């Protein structure tokens, strides 16, 4: 049965069907798992597995490197050790602990998810059920349901697409990663080890993160290299995904300090990305007294934008502030939630004044 499914799946999707049958797929699965059990990174959410730890790690790992996540995960688990404690926390405390990880909607959605979980009579176990929670998409729902409950659902993200595109030397061009993951879903599901779906998914993710890298893949130590068609030519050429040109953006911001108080802007609660977070205000929103003086410029990237942030020393009309702008005593700066870059800029500038 599996052989028929594979032939239909691979023939329909790729031209490079090369004798894959049930035996070859089983060898792929076994080689992958053997490598994973022997070489996997010892990560806290793997060493002490729990549903809550799995959910937290999946939220944190969205668009963020493992090395960055590790200290945040450890602090989070100490402060909010389970769904109930997290559900009872103030959002400001949740955002403060998340500070520096970016993409703060993840923290708010995780907080909302915890509140919903504690109200349920039983914990959901299927991918379909987890898809109903805020912030849980196709990838996270498959990861959570397979790792925590052994549901046979394959994960598909950019790492997984890269592995299978190279495995079959996929010549198709995709408009973006989203299209590639959608078209690879049936194929990756056909390769899933249904006896150990959670470990299989983690093994594939581990392979993409540590061996089958976007640049300079480590083909010589890859556990499944012997069945990879791209390994002998140009593996870096796969997958073929069109890259959008990054948009150049310039943002001018005010650093205004008066009577030991710093002017900050607080995003409203209905803001799409940074709700409730404080930041240095934009010059365009303020009434400036005199001529601003450039303090420094910083380059950063958010999604598809390349942003040049220019920070100016400015004098502000203190009694005529627009909505959402507040004077915050520098002694209390640590207490307000800010994004990582803004926190770093504020600390740097205040330290220069001492």
Annotated model-derived regions:
Residues 16-20, 31, 35-220, 224-234:
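Catalytic cores of DNA base-excision repair glycosylases
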Residues 1-41, 47, 206-354:
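Intrinsically disordered, low-complexity, charged terminal extensions of DNA damage-control enzymes
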């Amino acid at each position: 049965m599996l052989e028929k499914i594979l032939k239909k799946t691979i023939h329909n999707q790729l031209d490079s069907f090369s004798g894959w049958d049930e035996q070859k797929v089983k060898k792929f699965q076994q080689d992958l798992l053997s490598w994973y059990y022997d070489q996997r990174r010892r990560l806290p959410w793997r060493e002490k597995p729990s549903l809550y730890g799995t959910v937290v790690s999946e939220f944190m790992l969205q668009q963020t490197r493992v090395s960055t996540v590790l200290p945040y995960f450890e602090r989070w688990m100490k402060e909010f050790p389970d769904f109930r404690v997290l559900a009872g926390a103030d959002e400001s405390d949740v955002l403060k602990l998340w500070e520096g990880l970016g993409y703060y909607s993840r923290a708010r959605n995780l907080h909302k998810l915890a509140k919903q979980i504690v109200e349920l009579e039983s914990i959901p176990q299927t991918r379909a059920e987890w898809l109903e929670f805020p912030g849980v998409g196709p990838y996270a729902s498959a990861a959570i349901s397979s790792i925590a409950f052994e549901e046979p659902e394959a994960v598909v993200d950019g790492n997984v697409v890269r592995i299978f595109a190279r495995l079959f030397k996929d010549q198709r061009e995709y408009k973006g990663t989203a299209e590639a993951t959608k078209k690879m879903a049936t194929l990756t599901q056909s390769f899933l080890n249904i006896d150990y779906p959670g470990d299989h998914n983690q093994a594939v993710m581990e392979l993409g993160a540590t061996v089958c890298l976007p640049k300079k893949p480590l083909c010589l130590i890859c556990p499944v290299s012997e069945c990879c068609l791209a390994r002998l030519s140009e593996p870096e050429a796969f997958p073929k995904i069109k890259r959008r040109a990054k948009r150049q953006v310039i943002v001018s911001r005010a650093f205004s300090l008066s009577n030991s108080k710093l002017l900050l802007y607080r995003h409203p609660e209905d803001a799409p990305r940074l709700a409730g977070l404080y930041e240095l205000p934009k010059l365009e929103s303020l009434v400036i007294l005199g001529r601003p003086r450039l303090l420094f410029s910083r380059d950063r990237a958010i999604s598809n934008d390349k942003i040049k942030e220019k920070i100016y020393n400015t004098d502000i009309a203190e009694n005529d502030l627009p909505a959402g702008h507040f004077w915050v005593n520098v002694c209390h700066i640590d207490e307000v939630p800010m994004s990582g870059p803004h926190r770093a800029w504020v600390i740097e500038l205040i330290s220069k004044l001492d």
